[in-house]
Amino acid sequence: VFLCIRSGDSGRWWYEYVRKRMTVVYEDNHIIIVNKTASEIVQGDKTGDTPLSEIVKQYLKEKYQKPGNVFIGVTHRLDRPVSGLVVFAKTSKALSRLNEMFKTSEVKKTYWAIVKNAPKEPEGELVNYLVRNEKQNKSYAYDKEVPKSKKAILHYRLIGKSDNYFLLEVDLKTGRHHQIRCQLAKMGCPIKGDLKYGFARSNPDGSICLHARHISFVHPVSKEMIEVEAPVPPTNLWQGFQMI
């Protein structure tokens, strides 16, 4: 969804426009979970493009006909070229609790990644030490601890094959900057389209083939288990895998 929201924009036409293009996979009184498309930004940045957080806020304002400001809290982020699940808080209580849950790794996140090269082992755990370069907006992976590094752990499993690519399922154990992109590249399996981490060519739409597929956590207020899954992008590439 790419919109420039003008002051005073409102009405059912706008709500219907967004509703048809933004996939809400779960909503209750405290949280809303959206399937983000690649190219959307979760929170405002220097580009000035309308962030997903603002689109969700306007969507809720129209859906419930709220006269005042609508509260939306950003609990975590996905890189702009990544698609998949994003959790927003609709109340301050949910926001503070979810922030703590993400910080303490109480939220389980699973990603799917398309890579050109098959991993040497079909399943394994990657442990690296990542150093973030702010100027380059890039992380570098090391086998041993180095100054300013942070330990990064993920588990991967080969789950699908196509004529030209392999599909990996990735469970994050830590949440570091560009962690999956960096660690898979370090393993020799850069994500399709990810020029920054060594893939040869970009994707035509500027995306990378990384998708936040599944998320589960204990609801911050009701304490029920929330478990949701996002459909992969509707392209031949994503749909063309034979699952193992």
Task: Say what each PLM segment does.
Residues V1-I244:
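RNA pseudouridine synthases
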